[in-house]
Amino acid sequence: MNAHNSKIIGEGLTYDDVLLVPNYSNVLPREVNIQSKFSRNITLNVPIVSAAMDTVTESAMAIAMAQEGGIGVLHKNMTIEQQAAKVRKVKRAESGMIIDPVTLPLTATVADAKAAMKEFGIGGIPIVDEHKKLKGIVTNRDLRFEKNSARPIVEIMTSENLVTVAEGTSLEQAEVVLQGNKIEKLPVVDASYKLVGLITFRDITKLTQKPIANKDTFGRLRVAAAIGVTGDAVKRAEALVNAGVDAIIIDTAHGHTEGVVNVLKEVKSQFPKIDVIVGNIATAEAAKYLVDNGADGVKVGIGPGSICTTRIVAGVGFPQFSAVLEVAAAIKGSGVPVIADGGIRYTGDIPKALAAGADSVMMGSLLAGTKESPGETIIFEGRKFKSYRGMGSVEAMQEGSKDRYFQDVEDDIKKLVPEGIVGRVPYKGELNESMQQFIGGLRAGMGYCGSKDISTLQETGRFVRITTSGINESHPHNVTITKEAPNYSR
């Protein structure tokens, strides 16, 4: 009997199996501090991360996530060049001062300017000579009525009486110059008139519109990106670093392997200043192994996602609440943050995950229905949906995620063993609407627990295990819902 019992290491719980216990509180929900850590050196103003999935996070989602205080992880089901370009798009989306603005040479044409504006989503481009000296600026107003695409840009750019500021000009001073001259783009030049940056009125305005936006030291939005473990992993990492990525995630279905750590060591040795997060894992042993080998963050979750079938297909997994609890306890005090990836169904699951020890939560299905996700929009029976698929689905594997499930050597689609499905989720509108509900639920949970910040929630949060009857009692019951709430459906 004992021999049989030794095979059972314990009992696994999900978020539905527990509730946080209310505690004495002297803080209001609006007063709590929800800042946290994404990785060893990357902070979050909101502890929410969008998943590296090809129906969840591309540049639009990453921009919106960072503007709301979180961070997006760009998926890798694309070429290295495409992924690097999306990193650059996020980094250029807004800035205190754009330190590497898109420029065009004096030989450029109207067609070149229009193409660049469309590619990068910008409204003005400085024109420089071969020595990077500023010669003019062209804006979308200059191009709006120009029909001749072959016309040289020098014929329509503004070159006389250019308004510029010197290096070291503060944003407050720049705002005065912009308003005083009624312009939207302000080139920053050095003593020899070389272009060193660009300040835009739009970026200054966003500082007040999005005060909790997650930005780097240059005022640019933060963004992370995923790499795999195959031959191009280090090359992909190099391109991402050169594009300005803030953190890299080595994204696999099973992070507790020698091959994953080999990639981790190689990336860290070549790019020591970049934080590298590794996942996915579910045990204390895996967490210690990755931390001991230099991981700057660990991602927890084997099979909790709504579109994941790993636990059914492979018979392997770990209920998510227990996995987060075990991993967080194992590496407590190491300075390495924990990302709880998957299994978040309701806003109340967020404070549960954080109280269990996670520093942030990664979401897929709850974000896939937003306007900013790259999933296809579908009309079904008169309602709007967006497509959502697991990275272990056959369709996603065909696009490039086979290595995540260690099937990269298999070319025959019929021989792929999927660990995910393809589905749809209801359309939810713009991301900021959903984020308000996520943040509101987190703040409410922290208020009930008397936690002034996330570290306090992690230290003092206590749970009660509930039965199936307790779960039923927690949900609306004995009533027909006649008006849907924005943060609840079942």
Predicted segments with their positions:
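Alpha/beta catalytic cores of nucleotide-metabolism and tRNA/nucleoside-modifying enzymes
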Residues: 1-24, 104-105, 165-166, 173-176, ...
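Active-site-adjacent beta->alpha loops and helix N-cap segments on the catalytic face
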Residues: 30, 79-88, 146-150, 170, ...
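Bateman/CBS regulatory modules and CBS-like beta-alpha motifs in cytosolic regions of diverse proteins
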Residues: 30-44, 51-53, 82-120, 127-129, ...
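Short beta-strand/loop segments at the ligand-binding rim of alpha/beta enzyme cores
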Residues: 43-48, 96-101, 160, 216-226, ...
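Catalytic cores of alpha/beta
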Residues: 60-63, 235-243, 282-300, 340, ...
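Glycine-rich phosphate-binding active-site loops on the catalytic face of alpha/beta enzymes
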Residues: 67-82, 245-257, 296-314, 344-378
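Catalytic beta/alpha-barrel core
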Residues: 74-77, 103-104, 124-126, 164-165, ...
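Terminal amphipathic helices with adjacent charged low-complexity linkers/tails
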Residues: 76-91, 127, 131-143, 147, ...
